[in-house]
Amino acid sequence: MNKFTNFLKKCFTYTPTKKYNFVLEENNANSKDVDLPASFLPDQEVFQSLDKNYNYIKVQYNSLINSDIIMRPFTLNICGKKYSALFVGIDGMIDSELVNNFLLRPLMETNRLARKKRTQNGIEYKKIKKVNVEDYIFDKLLPQNSVQKVSKFSEVASAINSGNCALFIDTVNIAFSIDVKGFSSRGIDTPKNEIVVRGSQEAFVEKLRTNTSILRRLINTPDLIIESSTVGRANKTQIAVCYMKNIANSSLISEVKYRLANLDVDYVISSRKC
């Protein structure tokens, strides 16, 4: 019986092929918990240039490693003139159907209708009316019931982290905060194992993006980093490593990602079972 038990343990229990010692360096007296880059200004106002806004958002949200940040550049047509635009939102916190059908489609397709052609001296031409881009988009192209104009990136970040999306338009020095919140999964319930009297009563569920959205709502800052990867040979299970930039120890983060990358298992059932 013991031999059979040991055989099962070898089949289903992970044992590292080599042992190593990991030592976390202690901080000295002169070290700081948070090192903010000098170029980062929390109250920076939105630029008129879309390229500057795009680059600022990419740095602010670390889009190269943050897996749940959606940045969608596109072109919209206003009265015969094309403008570059940028949509920014968080996967798991926005309603994709609402965004596709009632935000991106009106902006990208509805206003493509050709202007009425006129003829003068035998030459056809299109009469283009000069409009205020900011007011035109706000009044005619955004059908959502809750749309706000924000002028600072701190306001943009707060809106995005709460489940709204941000819309940037080239030549316009404000951003539109649009309510497109939406969740589609099992309802979030109180935790069964970790019961607390104070603090949040929300428990994690089976869907990864719902869990990351819970963290985004509780930790309302762009400094929250969510890196996604897969674990498992037979079944690639999606996982996410979440930490606070400039606060979490970089050596510890690297060690966690190293161990996950070298985890030799077929399937991850839960956080305690492989």
Residues covered by each model-derived region:
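Membrane-embedded alpha-helical signal segments
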Residues: M1-C274
